[in-house]
């Protein structure tokens, strides 16, 4: 995807930013919502290190916003096997771990696994808007609905994942088969990310 963000993402950086200390985070923020807000802000502080391009920085910002507003359990139900709901403490633990992964991906280490993971995720999410039947999951859809005045719960609607159930439908035409291949590849990507999340205790 030559026009995607991967070519331009993850600029070189020599010094890691200060990561949140769990004890400090819990002491300074007495409830779950405030803890998430603090972590959300810390994710956004990495924005300058994602890319030298303003549009990619904005895309990263929108993606972080989407991830913090969506119903994470709705997404996990579709791609995580076996599925077990997370309690609030587990969610905080995973968001902290996710921040560490993104931070490490921004460090000047071209061969790091974290760097490759973040590049891949940004590239796939950037391409979502161009795949028919999946625009509801894209960052662009999220932004458009907000511009229309929709509430933020638009990213918690079950219909966002209707396309997953359509993959098993048999399509005969060449055009439909090509589309089905794209959908299947996207589903496999999300399943891979979900598996990574379960092993690494993250929420990418």
UniProtKB/Swiss-Prot annotation:
Keywords: Sporulation
Superkingdom, natural source: Eukaryota
One of the GO BP terms on file: sporulation resulting in formation of a cellular spore
Function: Involved in sporulation and maintenance of the mitochondrial DNA. Is probably involved in a pathway contributing to genomic integrity.
UniProt family annotation: Belongs to the IRC19 family.
The protein's name: Increased recombination centers protein 19
Gene name linked to the record: IRC19
